[in-house]
Amino acid sequence: MKFVGAHVSAAGGVDQAVIRAHELEATAFALFTKNQRQWRAAPLAEDVIEKFKLACEKYGYTSAQILPHDSYLINLGHPVTEALEKSREAFIDELVRCQQLGLSLLNFHPGSHLLQIDEDQCLARIAESINIALDATEGVTAVIENTAGQGSNLGFKFEHLAAIIERVEDKSRVGVCIDTCHAFAAGYDLRTEEDCEHTFAALGKIVGFQYLRGMHLNDAKSEFNSRVDRHHSLGEGNIGKTVFSYIMRDSRFDNIPLILETVNMDIWAEEIAWLKSQAEIEPSL
């Protein structure tokens, strides 16, 4: 079963994200549970939690179909202790919010060394941050997203993701989300079926498909191996549509949220419908 949707707005309340996903005829969705560009947010009120859970029940969304994203401000590999502590506290709060909403996943960007510590030190800090956060919470899996490698962001190599996972103590509560635009911009080609075979074989070998908890389905305005993160609508960028059809026909991507973060939300419903149609084609495996 393929779960397909988009990162929808939670303006007006988190329950509104559920309604917006339903209106797109999505079978999955992503959301922010708080303002993604602010450190602090009011705690979730009981009535807000209840409305969200009721909306999910009404429209048939389980936690396996929902991939919340944390704040963009959080840097779990921050080289400065005070800033690192602030990020860790905020990340724990994000996990708690997911827990309260009955969600089982939290997607996040791993972190940046800001040119002040080396890659391995930063990866170790990220893993330590995850361990601290998992110890302080329960029931929610920390889902590390690959990055385009823009600036000093880590996570652009599959080896980075594997190194973090290796250091996480509770392997049952860590996973990865692969963003196709980020992978392409980081040098993982996805333009042909053969490219897809090679890239996903590398993912399986280096990270392991048992850790795959979600996908972000985005074409790229950015060039191949440019280390620039610029999303585009499916088929309108430099990747093309092949990889998205490939994913929809491959059982390794079943039962996880497959989320659009493409640039034109006016055509999300069309993109979702097209993705669903690809799942009906003979499987690639």
UniProtKB/Swiss-Prot annotation:
SUPFAM superfamilies: Xylose isomerase-like. Zn(2+) 2 binds at E145, D179, H216, E261. One of its GO terms (biological process) is base-excision repair. Its EC number is 3.1.21.2. Binds 3 Zn(2+) ions. It catalyses: Endonucleolytic cleavage to 5'-phosphooligonucleotide end-products. It holds the Pfam family AP_endonuc_2. It is an enzyme of class 3 (hydrolase). GO terms for molecular function: deoxyribonuclease IV (phage-T4-induced) activity; DNA binding; DNA-(apurinic or apyrimidinic site) endonuclease activity; phosphoric diester hydrolase activity; zinc ion binding. Keywords: DNA damage, DNA repair, Endonuclease, Hydrolase, Metal-binding, Nuclease, Zinc. Its cofactor is Zn(2+). Zn(2+) 1 binds at H69, H109, E145. Zn(2+) 3 binds at H182, D229, H231. Endonuclease IV plays a role in DNA repair. It cleaves phosphodiester bonds at apurinic or apyrimidinic (AP) sites, generating a 3'-hydroxyl group and a 5'-terminal sugar phosphate. Belongs to the AP endonuclease 2 family. This is Probable endonuclease 4. The gene is nfo.
